[in-house]
A protein has these predicted regions:
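N-terminal amphipathic/basic leader segments beginning at the initiator methionine
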Residues: 1-30, 308
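Short glycine/serine/threonine-rich phosphate/pyrophosphate-binding segments
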Residues: 19-22, 42-47, 87-90, 208, ...
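N-terminal small/polar loop signature for handling phosphorylated ligands or for N-terminal nucleophile
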Residues: 28, 32, 38-59, 71, ...
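A glycine/threonine-rich phosphate-anchoring loop and its flanking beta-alpha core
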Residues: 55-154
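Short alpha-helical scaffolding segments that buttress acidic/His motifs in well-ordered protein cores
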Residues: 138-142, 183-194, 231, 266, ...
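Active-site segments that bind and position negatively charged phosphate/pyrophosphate groups
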Residues: 144, 148-265
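C-terminal charged capping/lid subdomain of soluble metabolic enzymes
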Residues: 246, 256-323
Length: 323
């Protein structure tokens, strides 16, 4: 298992020449009764979509995005995780890029019946992708925690523990990328952040994810790295709207006293990890220009349950602050 070759993939494509055509080749002619995803989040998401599309003659994208209907039957599937961070093995959601429409969005698909998480399977994943994936985990926990819910929610306590543990183990990997125990802890952090437990009894704020999804649709940038660029700017815009929660975040995750200090501690941690902090540092298929960021702001989903709903102009402004 340790000898497989890591191949980077940023997205799962939907549209002409992508998932639908591969599905026809992979499923229709062979009569499979189960699927096994072996890889990271993109591989697992692709199999989730294939497992859902295999059981309907309708176009899955149109069915969900236009008709707002969801699959009622899916092909059974399982997952062997070789690159952690997304938590894709723990739920029925899948993030899909439709290149024809320039939309990157979440869809309801198949949920794995089982998942195998062995940190030794991740040892050939390169340092930057491990850290980028772990930041996605941290983002999942943060975006759940900062949703506009009541204080003293038990799910918040669990989220803060996952954030703190993720930071601790990312720092361990910065010292020793082959620390199997740290990789194992991060695999479990990833699973816990997206298995639904943190979302019990609360609403969530995934505005940073919505911005990054559309940024990825236009640029093909790495998901975790795009989040690393966006999060500090976004939190500087909303910190005063959830000051008590940011203060607790700063104290319990980074050991600082004030809400603003918590945001800046997060920004410093991103630099410590060697993650990108500006749009120009992202690996992109095109130059990231103000025009692209305007398109991102105009087309991303706007979340109404974050501490304060943002206007599209404010989203554009904060994205420009990342240039």
């Amino acid at each position: 298992m340790q000898k497989f070759v890591y191949e980077y993939a940023t997205k799962v494509n939907f549209g002409a020449g992508a998932v639908k055509e591969h599905l026809a080749q992979a499923v229709s002619g062979y009569g499979q009764n189960v699927m096994l995803a072996y890889g990271g989040g993109s591989v697992i998401d692709c199999c989730k979509i294939v497992a859902a599309q295999a059981k309907t003659e309708e176009d899955l994208w149109e069915m969900e995005m236009t008709e707002h209907k969801f699959p009622t039957e899916v092909l059974p599937m399982g997952a062997i995780v070789t690159a952690s961070g997304t938590g894709a093995e723990m739920n029925g959601g899948a993030v899909i890029t439709n290149e024809e429409k320039v939309i990157k969005a979440g869809m309801a698909a198949a949920a794995p019946r089982f998942a195998i998480l062995d940190p030794e399977y991740t040892l050939s994943v390169p340092r930057m992708q491990v850290i980028s994936g772990a930041f996605d985990t941290l983002s999942h926990a943060m975006e759940t925690y900062f949703g506009n819910s009541d204080q003293d929610n038990v799910s918040d306590d669990v989220a803060l523990s996952i954030m703190r543990n993720t930071v601790v183990n990312m720092r361990r990997l910065l010292k020793d990328i082959n620390d199997v125990q740290a990789r194992g802890n991060l695999m479990w952090d990833s699973a816990m952040a997206e298995n639904g437990i943190l979302k019990v009894g609360r609403v969530t704020d995934f505005q940073a994810h919505q911005m990054e999804h559309q940024l990825g649709a236009y640029t093909d940038c790495n998901h975790g790295q795009g989040l690393a660029v966006i999060h500090p700017a976004y939190y500087r815009h909303i910190v005063k709207d959830a000051e008590e929660k940011f203060q607790r975040f700063g104290k319990e995750v980074f050991g600082v006293d004030s809400a603003q200090a918590g945001v800046e501690a997060l920004a410093d941690f991103i630099k410590e990890c060697g993650l990108p902090t500006k749009m120009g540092e992202l690996k992109s298929k095109v130059e990231i220009t103000p025009e692209i960021l305007r398109n991102v702001a105009d087309t991303c989903n706007v979340i109404k349950c974050n501490p304060r709903e943002l206007s599209r102009d404010e989203i554009y402004d904060l994205l420009m602050e990342c240039m």
